[in-house]
Amino acid sequence: MENQNQVKRNLKQRHITMIALGGTIGTGLFLTSGATISQAGPWGAVLAYCFIGIMVYFVMTSLGEMATYLPTSGSFSDYGGRYVDPAFGFALGWNYWLNGAITIAVDLTTAGLITQFWFPHLPSWIFSGIATVLIFIINVMAVGAFGETEYWLSTIKVITIVLFLAIGLLTIFGVLGQGNVDVVANLTAGNHGFVGGISGFVGVLLIAGFSFQGTEMLGITAGESEDPGKTIPKAMNSIFWRILLFYIFSIIVIAAIINFKDPRLLNPSSTAVMSPFTIVFKNIGFAVAASVMNAVILTSVISSANSVMYASTRILYSLGQEKGAPKFFGRTAKNGIPFYALLATTIICFIAFLTGIFGTQIYLFLIDLSSLTGFLAWLGISVSHIRFRRAYIAQGKKLEDLPYKAKWFPFGPIVALLMTGAIAINLDPAMLFSEHWGEGLALYAAIPIFIVLYFGYKWKYNTKIIPLEEVDLSREK
């Protein structure tokens, strides 16, 4: 294993676009979207995705400005350490690595759940294990080969969603399905399409947030992009709107064809979980198409895990380079792959997905925990951007010299900061006093863990919040 210490800039714009799409469109859309409909009703789910979508847009513009100015595989972990406080960057890095490990575990568990459609009598963990080995092999390849693989996997995913939307619309308007679907009744079920009122809406925000996680991979791919100054802004503009429209239209189609009370939708009491995409085809009488759709969804979930593995590995690699983790994590193989970081992430994920054996309650807890750590990452991006822009102005630099300028500053990052903070704090306190108190305690632990990482590093290295005039605005890593 050769320590070359540098990843390689072999990712083209189409790779970057599809890696971010692939990392975002996966379990969140193909399985957990059913949970938002089940718990908040059709329009409660749509409203939750719109709410989170606005917040994510502001986060994306903040990240885009920093990523084009200073492309690095450490992304917002590096930005937090450079523009705020080294301790802040350290905490962000480990938080995001934890987020990635949990997210991959969720995706791998999802892969096992999806295979139950064909093999209901076999343990789901067998297929989760096979998927783990597969994504490890893909990530061992040189980054160019990885990018090409993810490009085609994500292309299949996008085509699938477009076909699903087309068939769904034909069903809604009565062309398909032989009139078996009562669209009006499904969309107005509950309290005019809402279930649980405000609490139902707030309760699914974490799940909706989980669905949008992966958009921040755009910043991480900048470190291996051929021309980040041009590719990142173009990719960012196309990625966000594609993701938002895919989610909103898919939720509406699913809610129109499936009643929110359908027991096959993901919820804490589910015993036989099925993708809402597969349920749609079964409901309109396309049994063969349902099986094909399930197979495509399986590849999509593996694609999502594949992208997140890429991002998590790069974050751990960056921590190793910056002495925030053992040095060997900052080493690369001859093909530029941070092998030790990849191996460590795979081992953690392999252990974590076993928790999926204990049922949908634990599975939903993992989704919430993954979402919460993701919200902390988005919060960190917003804080870093505010500090970056203030330092940029304080040091007399011209805004027109920025490769990409966030349009809504300072409104955008401030709103994103307030929204992420409010959602992260406004979890479900009642869980701490219910039979699921252990899961509630573990979920809330994500915030104190971040705080301990921050102040622990601060205490050990005696760091401070960097004065604006002293912030390092050089464009070299």
Curated annotation (Swiss-Prot):
Knocked-out gene: effects: Deletion of the gene leads to strong reduction of histidine uptake.
Keywords recorded for this protein, A-Z: Amino-acid transport, Cell membrane, Membrane, Transmembrane, Transmembrane helix, Transport
Subcellular location: Cell membrane
UniProt superkingdom: Bacteria
Function: Involved in histidine uptake. Has low affinity for arginine and lysine. Plays no significant role in the excretion of accumulated histidine.
PANTHER family given in the database record: AMINO ACID PERMEASE, GENERAL AMINO-ACID PERMEASE GAP1
Protein name: Histidine permease HisP
Native species: Lactococcus lactis subsp. cremoris (strain MG1363)
